[in-house]
Design a protein with these regions (language model features):
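Long, charge-dense tracts
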Residues: 1-13, 46
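Primarily the internal scaffold of c-type cytochrome electron-transfer domains
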Residues: 1, 27-56, 61-175, 179-217
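Long, low-complexity, mixed-charge
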Residues: 21-22
């Protein structure tokens, strides 16, 4: 992201999900003001060790799970969900959801927003865009032939999970992508985030009664 030239002229809002520095410094000092500033200006003070890290998901003072991405906090609040009062199990999804989700930048001030108001399924989010609730949203890109503004779903993993049988069963992103491990009698959460197919014993077979070969196939 820092070195690509394929998308020139981007704003500071592009950095919202690239590390908690954006919240811990920029947002706490000036709210969403950073979002409309030039990308390079916002990125310049951030050092290599201040991007993704422990504080992306954990409060640096208490190490408890936290959600720092304010676009997600605001969008969930419009659904009457206070993420700061969420259960520990819900937080095991929200820490991922704050960035792994559909989003857009508002026309007024460039802030990050999420189209959750009508629901989390694809049809409800599309309705949100259609009904003019999207804060000046005009489209993600223009079709080169028709010159029509088009909608591009970014990466709606949160919505895909939230409307799944896994969510209904209380299984979160962390259960599958960062499963519990044991070492020397100690139980811990793996922080090697990857496909559950790489940890079928720990991630899948605790719930599924099929064989490992069947699950992988």
């Amino acid at each position: 992201l820092l070195h690509t030239k394929r998308l020139p002229g981007q704003k500071g809002s592009c950095l919202q999900c690239k590390g908690s520095y954006v919240y811990d410094v920029y947002f706490k000092e000036g709210g969403w003001a950073y979002a409309s500033k030039p990308f390079d200006e916002v990125a310049a003070p951030i050092t290599d060790d201040e991007w993704f890290g422990c504080s992306t998901c954990h409060d640096p003072d208490t190490m408890q799970l936290r959600v720092y991405q304010q676009g997600f906090v605001e969008a969930m609040a419009r659904r009457c969900v206070d993420v700061n009062a969420a259960s520990h199990n819900d937080m095991r999804a929200y820490v991922c959801a704050q960035c792994h989700t559909e989003y857009y930048f508002t026309a007024e001030d460039g802030r990050v927003n999420h189209p959750y108001d009508n629901g989390l399924d694809a049809e409800s989010e599309y309705k949100f865009y259609q009904t003019g609730q999207a804060g000046g949203f005009k489209g993600d890109w223009m079709h080169p032939d028709s010159k029509t503004m088009m909608l591009k779903a970014q990466h709606p993993e949160f919505e895909t999970w939230a409307t799944s049988v896994h969510a209904d069963a209380g299984v979160t992103c962390v259960d599958c992508h960062m499963p519990y491990m044991r070492d020397g009698g100690k139980k811990y959460t793996s922080h090697w985030m990857s496909s559950p197919l790489k940890y079928t014993k720990e991630a899948c077979l605790k719930c599924h009664d099929e064989s490992e070969e069947t699950l992988v196939a």
